[in-house]
Amino acid sequence: MLSVWNLPVEQQPQQQQQQQQNIINSSNNINSINSALDNILNTTSKGIQLPRFNLLNTSSSGFLTNSNDTLFLENNNNNNNNINQQLNKSVLNSSNKQLDIIKTINEISNEHKSFQPFEITPIKPQSTSTNTYNTEFGVINQNTFVLDSNKIEELRVDTSVLDPLLSLPYNIINNTTNNNNNNNNNNNNNNNNNNSNNNNSNNNNINNNNNKSNTPMKKESTIRNSNSTFEKFESPTLSTTFGLNKEELNTFTTTDMNNYVKQANMVKELSQVEKKELKRQKRLIKNRESAHLSRQRKRERLTDLEHRVEELSSNSIDINKTLSSLENENLILKAEVGQLFEVINDSPVLSALFYKIASLSQQPQKDTIGAY
């Protein structure tokens, strides 16, 4: 809080008196100083008085014939006169300034302006909110805003949470609005009839008016009750006759949809718009099922191909292993055969037996060739 105070008018004369007293004291001090200086000049030595006598009783030539001391003292006297003149000028200037100050103070006192103290308080913002937190002036209450990850995931999964009317078809909304308008019109007509009955009954006696005034109230209550029961009866049929929600479209099958249509036909004769809507929903369900089946077949085919590739890759690995082992065995056998040929060539007996065996083995081959 900042407070500003101005002096009232009653205290101003006291200040003026104090200032005038200060001015008088300063002027008295200046006069005492001047008188002291004059006394000092009058009570000087003989050497100081001689030049005055010479100045008054002698000529200029006699004055010049005096000693140097007298000339020096004359110069001191002139200097003192200059000092006195400067002091008088300063006193006059200070007195003039003090008179100007006194004039301004008198002018202010003549205006008679009384100033009262006032307070400077900060302006608080007017808020109609029911916030219990104490907010300071010029400070913004910044509440931390945190997003809920669970709610974001729910919105990503089900967009129908945003607005339930968006999940319903366009025809359902129009039909519901039309039904509500019709019900409101019927209620207005009933109220108008009741008002006309009341106006007619006012022309009769007071007792008759009291008796008749109770009957339309009963009629209105019965009409309202009947309307409420009718709405309660129609509320479950709206979802059964006008179509399915988005969740139901994602969960229903063709058999469920056929049963749903049968129940709707049993409850109410469907209009052309409703039939088109149900056909559209059937087509959507069939497309969803066919797409699901095609995806399932593709998935099964892909899984079969993956298993087949795995089997073939394992078989190829086994075959490569057997080939490598057979190649090694073939190399070993070739080495053994080469060693046997060397042994046979080294021994003549073995070479003779080898040639006989070879000749005997070639004769039956020739016989078979001749028979063919």
Curated annotation (Swiss-Prot):
Where is the segment annotated Disordered?
1-20, 176-234
> What ranges does the record give for the region Basic motif, renumbered to this chain?
279-301
User: Which SMART domains does the entry mention?
Assistant: BRLZ (SM00338)
Q: Give the primary localization class.
A: nucleus
Q: Where is the composition biased (Polar residues)?
A: 223-234
Q: Which InterPro entries match?
A: bZIP, bZIP_sf
The subcellular location is:
Nucleus
The record's comment on protein family reads: Belongs to the bZIP family.
Descriptive protein name: Probable basic-leucine zipper transcription factor G
> Native species of this protein?
Dictyostelium discoideum
Q: What is the lineage of its organism?
A: Eukaryota, Amoebozoa, Evosea, Eumycetozoa, Dictyostelia
